[in-house]
Amino acid sequence: MLLEAEFWVAVAFFIFMGIAWKVGAFSAMTKGLDGRANRVRHELDEAKRLREEAAAVLADYKRRRAEAEKEAEAIVAGAREEAERAAEEGHRKLDDFLARRTKAAETKIAQAEAQAEAQVRAAAAEAAVKVSETILRERMQGDAAQNLIRASLGEVRTRMRS
């Protein structure tokens, strides 16, 4: 048993472990492993924090995007309503303008009719006066007849014009 290699390997292993324990190699290895574990834990915490921050930024982006979409929809709806109001106002103004123009045209037509009627009456009165004057001159003679004709014609003209 003392000559077997396994025995001497085991003895060398235990001697090496004893020396390593005496020198403090186990505490150095433990400190190294603990430091590495702390670094990994810190990196995991940092990754978790960054992930939460990214999630918050994403949520904020989604919220802002939704608000912007709502605002854009409100702006479009407002513009659409304003355009409809402007179109209605334009139609109303056009209708008012056409009504005023129609009324003005009707007024001008009525004035033209009244003027034409007055001119026809005046022409008819003038013609009647001339015909009456001609008839009276042919039938009546003398100064008295001329004075009577002038007075009568003046009276006829006055009555026809009024």
From Swiss-Prot:
Entry keyword annotation includes Transcription regulation: no
Localisation: Cell inner membrane
Membrane topology field: Single-pass membrane protein
Record-linked InterPro entries: ATP_synth_b/b'su_bac/chlpt, ATP_synthase_B_chain
TM stretches of this protein: 1-21
Family note: Belongs to the ATPase B chain family.
Function: F(1)F(0) ATP synthase produces ATP from ADP in the presence of a proton or sodium gradient. F-type ATPases consist of two structural domains, F(1) containing the extramembraneous catalytic core and F(0) containing the membrane proton channel, linked together by a central stalk and a peripheral stalk. During catalysis, ATP synthesis in the catalytic domain of F(1) is coupled via a rotary mechanism of the central stalk subunits to proton translocation.
Designated name of the protein: ATP synthase subunit 1
Organism this protein belongs to: Methylobacterium radiotolerans (strain ATCC 27329 / DSM 1819 / JCM 2831 / NBRC 15690 / NCIMB 10815 / 0-1)
